[in-house]
């Protein structure tokens, strides 16, 4: 049995995601954002971390892997959407903290495997239960993006939001 640790993620999550997705549409944007994420990965001492990226289209998900690893700062940025946390890191491509949102075009619950962690992000959950954290051993970083099953409206209704 897995020991699951829940962490909070703050923002009017569904409304913000839906609004920002209007600017992040299309497979080209999604691909760019995932490549940019790999490009932005750094080692703890600031050196470039990812040198390879692969995309694997599976029946149940899109799997994107790179050979870099998430630092604590990278995990924090995923939890604090739109924080602009990369602005001070001149070597990074991203700056505004919204690119990862592009994954919600195709998934309801993105998963991140990196640095001994497996996160599943569930935007339709309460703020303090949106990020499920488990331990996982994997070299590099993997994004598992299970194909979306519901529309945004269905997701908002399931979460108790009607606006």
Please give the residue ranges for each predicted region:
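Well-ordered, non-membrane alpha-helical segments in soluble/globular domains
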Residues: 154-163
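GHKL (Bergerat-fold) ATPase N-terminal catalytic module, capturing the glycine-rich phosphate-binding loop
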Residues: 1-154
């Amino acid at each position: 049995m897995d020991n699951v640790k829940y962490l909070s993620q703050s923002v009017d999550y569904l409304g913000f995601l839906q609004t920002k997705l209007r600017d992040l549409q299309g497979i080209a944007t999604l691909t760019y954002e995932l490549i940019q994420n790999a490009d932005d990965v750094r080692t703890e001492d600031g050196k470039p971390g990812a040198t390879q990226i692969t995309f694997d289209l599976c029946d149940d998900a899109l799997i994107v892997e790179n050979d870099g690893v998430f630092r604590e700062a990278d995990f924090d940025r995923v939890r604090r959407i739109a924080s602009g946390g990369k602005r001070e890191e001149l070597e990074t491509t991203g700056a505004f903290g919204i690119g990862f949102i592009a994954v919600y075009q195709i998934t309801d619950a993105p998963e991140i495997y990196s640095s001994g962690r497996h996160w599943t992000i569930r935007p339709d959950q309460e703020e303090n239960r949106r990020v499920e954290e488990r331990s996982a051993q994997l070299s590099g970083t993997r994004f598992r993006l299970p194909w979306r099953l519901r529309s945004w409206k269905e997701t908002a209704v399931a979460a108790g939001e009607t606006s």
